[in-house]
Amino acid sequence: MMEILRGSPALSAFRINKLLARFQAARLPVHTIYAEYVHFADLNAPLNDDEHAQLERLLKYGPALASHAPQGKLLLVTPRPGTISPWSSKATDIAHNCGLQQVNRLERGVAYYIEAGTLTNEQWQQVTAELHDRMMETVFFALDDAEQLFAHHQPTPVTSVDLLGQGRQALIDANLRLGLALAEDEIDYLQDAFTKLGRNPNDIELYMFAQANSEHCRHKIFNADWVIDGEQQPKSLFKMIKNTFETTPDHVLSAYKDNAAVMEGSEVGRYFADHETGRYDFHQEPAHILMKVETHNHPTAISPWPGAATGSGGEIRDEGATGRGAKPKAGLVGFSVSNLRIPGFEQPWEEDFGKPERIVTALDIMTEGPLGGAAFNNEFGRPALNGYFRTYEEKVNSHNGEELRGYHKPIMLAGGIGNIRADHVQKGEINVGAKLVVLGGPAMNIGLGGGAASSMASGQSDADLDFASVQRDNPEMERRCQEVIDRCWQLGDANPILFIHDVGAGGLSNAMPELVSDGGRGGKFELRDILSDEPGMSPLEIWCNESQERYVLAVAADQLPLFDELCKRERAPYAVIGEATEELHLSLHDRHFDNQPIDLPLDVLLGKTPKMTRDVQTLKAKGDALAREGITIADAVKRVLHLPTVAEKTFLVTIGDRSVTGMVARDQMVGPWQVPVANCAVTTASLDSYYGEAMAIGERAPVALLDFAASARLAVGEALTNIAATQIGDIKRIKLSANWMAAAGHPGEDAGLYEAVKAVGEELCPALGLTIPVGKDSMSMKTRWQEGNEECEMTSPLSLVISAFARVEDVRHTITPQLSTEDNALLLIDLGKGNNALGATALAQVYRQLGDKPADVRDVAQLKGFYDAIQALVAQRKLLAYHDRSDGGLLVTLAEMAFAGHCGIDADIATLGDDRLAALFSEELGAVIQVRAADREAVEAVLAQHGLADCVHYVGQAVSGDRFVITANGQTVFSESRTTLRVWWAETTWQMQRLRDNPECADQEHQAKSNDADPGLNVKLSFDINEDVAAPFIATGARPKVAVLREQGVNSHVEMAAAFHRAGFDAIDVHMSDLLAGRTGLEGFHALVACGGFSYGDVLGAGEGWAKSILFNDRVRDEFATFFHRPQTLALGVCNGCQMMSNLRELIPGSELWPRFVRNTSDRFEARFSLVEVTQSPSLLLQGMVGSQMPIAVSHGEGRVEVRDAAHLAALESKGLVALRYVDNFGKVTETYPANPNGSPNGITAVTTESGRVTIMMPHPERVFRTVSNSWHPENWGEDGPWMRIFRNARKQLG
């Protein structure tokens, strides 16, 4: 039976206004819109009155429910029938954890009530199209129609393909019907294999073969034989990549054989809790570094949010499934799309060339895709610290004559680093009889055929197959699985995981054969043991769907009880679905129909399928020289600063958590003005050291339209000039991931791909001492469609994205682009050797040209010398600022450095040649360094020692003030105020934020950027940062116990434990499942801290589901009430823990006036480094800190204080319960965005109880307790940042 319960309003006023504006623009006479959530409960038994009240209370969250009866025509948007939304999975978990076992499932829809003039059926279809994502959702016209969400269908049996009766044609028909993308020779192979077996294949076997042998999974082109211009080539593409490892194997521990590559890290204290006691401690051991970069292009073109989210999620799983289990740590993301054409902000180079109906626009991708990628990383708890963004779409005269080149099929790049124990780097042995396990969520009828779909050019497959290949994301489930993997690797030798892979393209049909085959075994499986929420799925759908957040593992049979215990504690679902066999055979039994849908020798599936040969021709580019007529430097500057590739990326940065883990030493945002211009991302290797890891990206795809090899060389060069900004040492410590995107089969592109791979794999990287131990290829970068009777094609440029990773010697020595105005000199190191080529530059693009000659690596020895010289100068602390020259050229390099330093530039380019335009906009490799005037001679000597004397040019100095002036020989070449340039550079991000977020907030942020008087972040402390008030108490040897409390989805507990540990506590890991099961109580603890993250993925309100699982369980409720009433206890709630504890007011004495915390005014997750002041309050944790003003990490989507009315706010203030407030850079309490990131009244961001024993706050002190993890800090701070005082106060209070 289904019950319907009304929910809170679903859309903020500005979202409704945006919808109305869209309807008006489409000339649809819609007058009013009201939207509210509607909940549907599928019950297996009736609820009594108490249970019903409990369910109603559970589903009461967010803004107050509307009292009026809605008016207008109902359009009910729900998840597609036959799918289960992430919201449903998590809300149902909460209901069960609150004791409501009668609830089979909860689901949620949005009911839109629309009042409109007379609309035709076609116009109503336009309205519904605006309200839902057809890939994920459906529209009903009555609430009762939602019954379809819970419809159950009978299982369907496997289908046989009549090969023996109908011959080869049966396979050809199945290939088209199922969208298998099989080549002719593969059809021949299958015909031969099944004829020899003497039976017909089942659809599931063909599907499994297609996925396992798709280009996506098998990389056929990279393993192919090559004939170019009639000449047989000696090596495959992959062999040329492997050549880099053969030449420079140094420091690589694993390459080409696992889900990620591994290189040597540093010996540090890894911090985690003991399995038996729950006590956190440091474990001194090597923390080796793993690296992986994936792409998820096809799904992102179809449905950008889930496409980008599952792209990030899949890459995170690759990291976790490395070796015998590893820990993902920090991420990067990238996008290449066609022109944005932002409404009202269209640029002169942006022409509309049309697109296929089935894919979304570049603007849609960049509105939704980055949010999906960021949301997954945020909820999983991985900081996103690096990225790139390129737009390109133009009709150009390239290798193949005049044609359309651009990114209608986008690049969505997701990558990152992690850490792994030395003894877990290599996979283990799979014993015969080992249990084969699926860890993670249930099978669902989604994401079918993603591997094969990704391997086709967009436009070749049926639209319904595109629809089927989109996946959905549930990062909170992946977090639970990762917690299990963490518990396993933390056991060291007792790790129960023998072998692990992630489930990606092809689902279990690819993952399980790969698992057993890699382990040298076969496998027998039971289909019906696979967890599934949809009983009506066919065997093919159960085995081959790409439901996310799953891993496959081999676990020794005698270790299964331990594994079961770990999974139950973390509430991570798992199923034992088979066991490993001696015989290399794959069998899948179906208990329901008592038949064998799969019964195959493994070598039929993964054996010697036909090898591809590429027989291709070379084409030379025909580019025309850059036409200069009408180009002025002033106009060029404004255009280039508006090009999204160059323009400010804040709209892509602040949506992503950049502080979680407490180990982020360098994020994108630089300096007191938080400008997103960092050269590279840097993390600390642990919470107790200055060793670290660095990541950087290099990419110059448009250059490939003129010169394939130069484009590839520049990508490597740019990655190197970016990562050089931190202290790495020997260049052999740097390892690269190469992600290759090409339109295979397009005239000239295959030969160009070979040329590019050869340039990097055979020549440049071996000469530099660089290794490429990991990478990925995507070979179908083309879209086709029809405009009227005309056939259209958009082909991407050959695109190589290089991600560089390295161990860091000392993270404190990372150099940023932030200029200083002390007596200084700016030096350009020009690795272009004066060539100043303008082909395929940002300048050429904004004037709709390509040019003829591009930049290139002009001298490999000088590039190596450059890296070594910069490393020497970094180690000697001789550099004040550093920024590489890249998109936009020297002009942009200097401008970004000035923005970061909030200063002026007095530049002189006389020594850079007579062509001023080329000197300023050429994108040859190089960098600008700032040095003290007194050090200039010594610095130039170091550069000369490394063979760079002829590359060094003095180009002026940074000056205080607002002027940005470039001269040559006494003549002004360009002059403008830095503030004006800053505003131009910011306009793209402003327009994107206005479209996507609350436009009022976007306007406030943009306005703030034009304030030259802004002093930036600054610090005023009322206490001595170096005083350790806990020291006398630590000296006693007593270590009070603090319960570090987490719920499923919490992700900030480790850094929280480390902060308390440093202050003299024994930090104990306490999961809510421990309390609910009675394994642990709170009676033995002196302090309790509820940590940040996304408990239950923030469904049912941020922290509210967590709180209700306490309030609705009598024993646990009493446990918390007793703790809060016990004198001499302390409690802290941070972020999600703050939201949770604000909902426990009925249990916490003196908290009656606490507010609720609701959706930010911006309607967006906000990750900021914000200034707060400590106010006078009873809070025991903030004693001695009153009056201090200091920055702190902020990361939340629901942090806005909501009070009942003005009287409630006045009472909260008059009782003195406000503990922290947001202030602007002038020290004034603020409600203005983004200084106040959530819009809380009076800047309130922390409150306390009347006794001061319980304090809750939205910002994260535990992420910045070390100075090194602050995005910016005064230079005189030592190891501990000022927020360490909170934790020491806690220790002092407990005596």
UniProtKB/Swiss-Prot annotation:
Main location: cytoplasm
Associated pathway: Purine metabolism; IMP biosynthesis via de novo pathway; 5-amino-1-(5-phospho-D-ribosyl)imidazole from N(2)-formyl-N(1)-(5-phospho-D-ribosyl)glycinamide: step 1/2
Any GO MF annotation of the entry: phosphoribosylformylglycinamidine synthase activity
InterPro entries given in the database record: Class_I_gatase-like, FGAR-AT_N, FGAR-AT_PurM_N-like, PurL_large, PurL_linker, PurM-like_C_dom, PurM-like_C_sf, PurM-like_N_sf
Function: Phosphoribosylformylglycinamidine synthase involved in the purines biosynthetic pathway. Catalyzes the ATP-dependent conversion of formylglycinamide ribonucleotide (FGAR) and glutamine to yield formylglycinamidine ribonucleotide (FGAM) and glutamate.
Residues binding ATP, per UniProt: G307, A308, A309, T310, G311, S312, G313, G314, E315, I316, R317, D318, A678, S886
Domain Glutamine amidotransferase type-1 per the UniProt entry, residue ranges: 1042-1295
CDD domains linked: GATase1_FGAR_AT, PurL_repeat1
Family annotation (SMART domains): GATase_5
GO BP annotations, alphabetical order: 'de novo' IMP biosynthetic process
Subunit structure: Monomer.
Catalytic reactions on record: N(2)-formyl-N(1)-(5-phospho-beta-D-ribosyl)glycinamide + L-glutamine + ATP + H2O = 2-formamido-N(1)-(5-O-phospho-beta-D-ribosyl)acetamidine + L-glutamate + ADP + phosphate + H(+)
UniProt keyword terms in alphabetical order: ATP-binding, Cytoplasm, Glutamine amidotransferase, Ligase, Magnesium, Metal-binding, Nucleotide-binding, Purine biosynthesis
One Pfam family named in its UniProt record: FGAR-AT_PurM_N-like
Protein known as: Phosphoribosylformylglycinamidine synthase
The species this protein was found in: Escherichia coli O6:K15:H31 (strain 536 / UPEC)
Enzyme class at the top of the EC tree: ligase
Entry-linked SUPFAM superfamilies: Class I glutamine amidotransferase-like, FGAM synthase PurL, linker domain, PurM C-terminal domain-like, PurM N-terminal domain-like, PurS-like
The keyword Transferase is assigned to this record: no
Keyword Metal-binding: yes
Segments for region (Disordered): 305-327
Record-listed Mg(2+) binding positions: E718, N722, D884
UniProt family annotation: In the N-terminal section; belongs to the FGAMS family.
Active site: C1135, H1260, E1262
EC code(s) of this entry: 6.3.5.3
Designated gene of the protein: purL
Subcellular compartments: Cytoplasm
